[in-house]
């Protein structure tokens, strides 16, 4: 029986730092939604995010020597999947844009992403994609109760996606986070219940 935290032992203060950091990251995402408009470039948004991270007393994890990414945030537009650095691309109304951000607050890392449509409401297939993937996220979160295996989380996510007739990019997975940006375990978006790594209360993914 695995009795240690797969994502590393953390003090209550470190867990609280992650909660506080997560709130700061969520606020930055709202700031992006309020700020972005057609006519701005991806690099404009990167600079804006960099300034907000500093304003909120955190640091841009991507820009550290550990990661050495050329920007504060990943910005992936339309057919780009994920992890794209900001470019000179100028946003147009209706662009589908994903933002992936990691910040460090009090030495603890928090990592999240969201997708939006520039200057418009999602419609048709794009609306179905965004609403279904969001529901799959919350299905995965709802599967986390007490000791749980990563396969249970993955299976809950996969069911929503399959019911919505969406494909799954199997090479991209969730992961542990906290003491480092990327930590074990991998948390795929597909899987079987009662398989995978056992998580305990105190693990952070």
Write out the residue ranges for each language-model feature.
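Active-site neighborhoods and metal-handling regions in enzymes and metal-associated proteins
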Residues: 1-205
């Amino acid at each position: 029986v695995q009795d240690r935290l797969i994502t590393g032992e953390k003090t209550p203060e470190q867990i609280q730092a992650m909660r506080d950091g997560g709130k700061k990251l969520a606020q930055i995402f709202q700031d992006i939604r309020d700020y972005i408009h057609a006519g701005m470039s991806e690099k404009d948004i990167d600079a804006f995010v960099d300034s907000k991270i500093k304003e909120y007393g955190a640091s841009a994890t991507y820009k550290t020597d550990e990661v050495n990414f050329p920007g504060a945030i990943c910005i992936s537009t339309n057919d780009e999947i994920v992890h794209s650095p900001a470019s000179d691309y100028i946003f147009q109304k209706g662009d589908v844009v994903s933002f992936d951000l990691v910040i460090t607050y009090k030495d603890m890392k928090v990592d999240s992403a969201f997708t939006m449509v520039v200057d418009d409401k999602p419609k048709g297939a794009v609306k179905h994609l965004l609403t279904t993937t969001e529901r799959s996220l919350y299905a995965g979160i709802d599967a986390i109760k007490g000791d749980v295996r990563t396969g249970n989380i993955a299976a809950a996510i996969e069911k929503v996606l399959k019911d919505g007739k969406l494909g799954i990019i199997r090479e991209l997975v969730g992961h542990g986070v906290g003491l480092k940006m990327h930590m074990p375990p991998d948390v795929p978006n597909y899987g079987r219940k009662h398989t995978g790594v056992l998580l305990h209360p105190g693990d952070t993914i």
